[in-house]
Amino acid sequence: MTPGIRPLVAGNWKMNGKGESLTELRAIAAGLSSDLGRKLDAVICVPATLLSRAAETLEGETVGLGGQDAHFKTSGAHTGDISPEMLKEAGATHVILGHSERRTDHHESNKLICAKTEAAWAAGLVAIVCVGETASERKAERALDVIGDQLSGSLPDGVTAENTIIAYEPVWAIGTGLTPTVQDVRAAHAFMREQLIERFGAKGAHLRLLYGGSVKPSNAAELLGVADVDGALVGGASLKAADFLAICETYRNL
């Protein structure tokens, strides 16, 4: 944790969830309506098909709602894409950009992610920008170089703590059950903080840095207690309210 920075736990449902999944969303909102919700912020990033219904479900609740990607244009001939303005109209407050699955499956570059981030800001969305190295890059001892390049290329100059959140997700840990050591997480987050302060000054010191990659109730306390880890981007464990809330509960004792 970073003193003075309010923690955030964000859930990424990925390509999961249909109408019946809103029951889990209601349970998450109910669990965070108690004193627990005063200890942290929470956001759930659902598939685009659920956004409007999820917004209705979360009306009046403290839980934020996010999309999982957005185009850099406001409209046009981009079949299958969704603009930041569309996400905003559907009820989103946040959007994930640059997730490794987008970088890999759709060959998204840092330059493209930078353009998407600026577009998200223009629409009034908070951008959750993801960075992280592959297994081969870590084995070659290039993890920090890769993270640095992604931060440099994916972030526009207008970054503030209000419009941007950074999520470090080592690619090899996503959905595998594997997690880096506490020492590795600490080193990555310390490096990111250093790079952000060097570029953005005091603004970089106040950005929220999330850890993602096989975060679950059993390892949340260990990971979320690391210096400069200001929350988590949770994948599979966010699909079940009990698991997501158990991760949030970690902040009662940190």
Curated annotation (Swiss-Prot):
InterPro entries: Aldolase_TIM, TIM_sf, TrioseP_Isoase_bac/euk, Triosephosphate_isomerase, Triosephosphate_isomerase_AS. It catalyses: D-glyceraldehyde 3-phosphate = dihydroxyacetone phosphate. GO terms for cellular component: cytosol. It is found in: Cytoplasm. Pathway: Carbohydrate biosynthesis; gluconeogenesis; Carbohydrate degradation; glycolysis; D-glyceraldehyde 3-phosphate from glycerone phosphate: step 1/1. It comes from the Bacteria. Its EC number is 5.3.1.1. The active site is at residues 99, 169. It holds the Pfam family TIM. Substrate binds at residues 12-14, 175, 214, 235-236. GO terms for molecular function: triose-phosphate isomerase activity. GO terms for biological process: gluconeogenesis; glyceraldehyde-3-phosphate biosynthetic process; glycerol catabolic process; glycolytic process. The keyword Lipid biosynthesis does not apply. Keywords: Cytoplasm, Gluconeogenesis, Glycolysis, Isomerase. Involved in the gluconeogenesis. Catalyzes stereospecifically the conversion of dihydroxyacetone phosphate (DHAP) to D-glyceraldehyde-3-phosphate (G3P). Homodimer. Belongs to the triosephosphate isomerase family. This is Triosephosphate isomerase.
